[in-house]
């Protein structure tokens, strides 16, 4: 792999806020030479409208969906709820730290590029725009993971990455272009061998499911393909370098496999890394490996 496209998830001290007194957020413990940002790195900055308290912690207006109100909370407090929402709080320490870094990266990228759909909020607990959130799931392990990675985000060329992750790679990660139909360059996403834990659930590593003809027709329509009449054939399109299918062919007509998966139910069709596809007597049978889009960090690999 060329060095130009190789990313070892640079852990920048990226939430330095030079516009405010005491604004530097130093991680604890101090990062070693393998992870700290280069001396000449242009570190990403918080938007100017984000307030930083006297301890250097960004303060966010968070719309809490379950309570239908906006709460003011420090970034690290918000991240605790996100981490508990995205990963089980009894998982290994290093896995929690990795997820915390990605969660913080997601927040910084969101604040830099987007606005919350909720008026007066910087971000929310609504998974339609942000990350899962579970304040009740926060325990000492969660707090420690957030504290020990304080200020750390994953960067590529001094910019926060799009912090994609998935549950299980099925043995191969994928690029954002293929795994997510992403239209912009994201060279830090690569096809690599997965390193999933042997303790991962069997139905995440390998899965099988079935769908009715009506479900397939509706999913195709939701994914942008309107079928006239019933279904005669269902086939897998070409595979990318990771082995994932880019398109599903319904009566010979292509539809994005990623969009079809979301439309038909991503908790049943768990990935596009298909190992079997067959249509007979009004039933679509699918089997595959992995859980999720396969882009970025595998949680069971972490």
Stretches found by the model and what they are:
Residues 1-302:
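Conserved, single-site charged/polar hotspot
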